[in-house]
């Protein structure tokens, strides 16, 4: 069975949570007999077809980028051709231009939307886009949310309860590198035996300014991995607050990231807005058996991190509450270790890539069977 995935960006040209989810979905469902192809936009689409892991990436030229939305003229032809060869089309939402491609190409294959996030920030544009969005979501056969938390709190998904399913994101730990002893010793010597860790892009919804405010007047060692548009602003904030034990490492490679995950004491994840729909790096912390601190924003973060079991969940945008949670974990190492074990057990139970691949392959086959059944009914009339 061939599945066509469609999203505006993809690895390795851009690295983000959605791209990583698509990769894990393609690789994990591939072991269940799914032939995955990804169509995406690229500023340099040469070569246009690239084998990537166990799947294939097709690239169309990016002609225009406006309000985080990529546009392309050539993608209409490529999508029409690739969709004709596919058994199922898997759209990755949100991307308004994708909706146009869906309708203007007359796509009539079984279709599913992976609903990664509500549209949060572009509220003015959302008013213009809403009629098209509603028509698009109404037209597809299934919608998939990544957590029951997000499904129950999304005003959009509430309108499509009958066709919406929940399949959580999953990670393959075996696919992560195993850091060399020298690499581990390097970071242990540089950072010390215990530190809190944040991993992620420095975006507006990540709440890093809240984390820095929470550290004022404390000396907890905190390691921040990642870069992004707020980098200079956060550096300035840390300096203004006189924070001497915050280590900004910028981007690191995967081996260094795993080394830091293994060595860390606990994960801090201060995202305070619903734009943080799941939290892949939070799940990575659980995968490596770390207790977590996150905020209650009604999304998948509180499906990964269960308060009092795998870590602590605090109200969003409250530095004092975040500071108190950090203090509690720091002063209760035995309980923190137990929470870390619980976090890893929860990952193994719910969030493995194998489980994600199995459930998605079942959904794809269900869609094909429904299509075949509807054709049979029509032919019998």
Swiss-Prot record:
Substrate binds at residues 19, 116, 206, 252. Signal peptide: none annotated. Changing residue 254 to A: Residual catalytic activity using GDP-D-Rha as a donor and GlcNAc-alpha-PO(3)-PO(3)-phenylundecyl (GlcNAc-PP-PhU) or GalNAc-PP-PhU as acceptor substrate. InterPro entries: Glyco_trans_1 (IPR001296), Glyco_trans_4-like_N (IPR028098). Its main location: cytoplasm. Potential target of antibacterial drug development. Changing residue 26 to A: No effect on enzyme activity. Rescues the common polysaccharide antigen (CPA) biosynthesis to the wild-type level in cells having knockout of this gene. One of its GO terms (molecular function) is hexosyltransferase activity. It is found in: Cytoplasm. It holds the Pfam family Glycos_transf_1. GO terms for cellular component: cytoplasm. Gene3D superfamilies: Glycogen Phosphorylase B. Its EC number is 2.4.1.-, 2.4.1.348. Pathway: Lipopolysaccharide biosynthesis; LPS oligosaccharide biosynthesis. Keywords: Antibiotic resistance, Cytoplasm, Glycosyltransferase, Lipopolysaccharide biosynthesis, Transferase. Disruption phenotype: Lack of common polysaccharide antigen (CPA) biosynthesis. Biosynthesis of O-specific antigen (OSA), also called B band, is unaffected. Increased susceptibility to the antibiotic colistin. Not activated by dithiothreitol (DTT) using GlcNAc-alpha-PO(3)-PO(3)-phenylundecyl (GlcNAc-PP-PhU) as acceptor substrate. 0.25% Triton X-100 and 0.125% NP-40 increases the activity 2.5-fold and 2-fold, respectively. 0.125% octyl glucoside has little effect on activity. Slightly increased activity with Mg(2+) and Pb(2+), while no effect with Mn(2+), Co(2+), Ni(2+), Cu(2+), Zn(2+), Ca(2+) or EDTA. Not inhibited by N-butyryl-galactosamine-alpha-benzyl or N-butyryl-glucosamine-beta-benzyl. Belongs to the glycosyltransferase group 1 family. Glycosyltransferase 4 subfamily. Non-processive alpha-1,3-D-rhamnosyltransferase. Catalyzes the transfer of one D-rhamnose (D-Rha) residue from donor substrate GDP-D-Rha in alpha-1-3 linkage to both GlcNAc- and GalNAc-diphosphate-lipid acceptor substrates. Is also able to transfer D-mannose (D-Man) to these acceptors at a lower level. Nucleotide sugars GDP-D-Rha, GDP-Fuc, UDP-Gal, UDP-GalNAc, UDP-GlcNAc and CMP-sialic acid cannot act as donor substrates. Only compounds with a diphosphate as the aglycone group can act as acceptor substrates. No activity is detected with compounds containing a diphosphate mimic. This is D-rhamnosyltransferase WbpZ. It comes from Pseudomonas aeruginosa (strain ATCC 15692 / DSM 22644 / CIP 104116 / JCM 14847 / LMG 12228 / 1C / PRS 101 / PAO1). The gene is wbpZ.
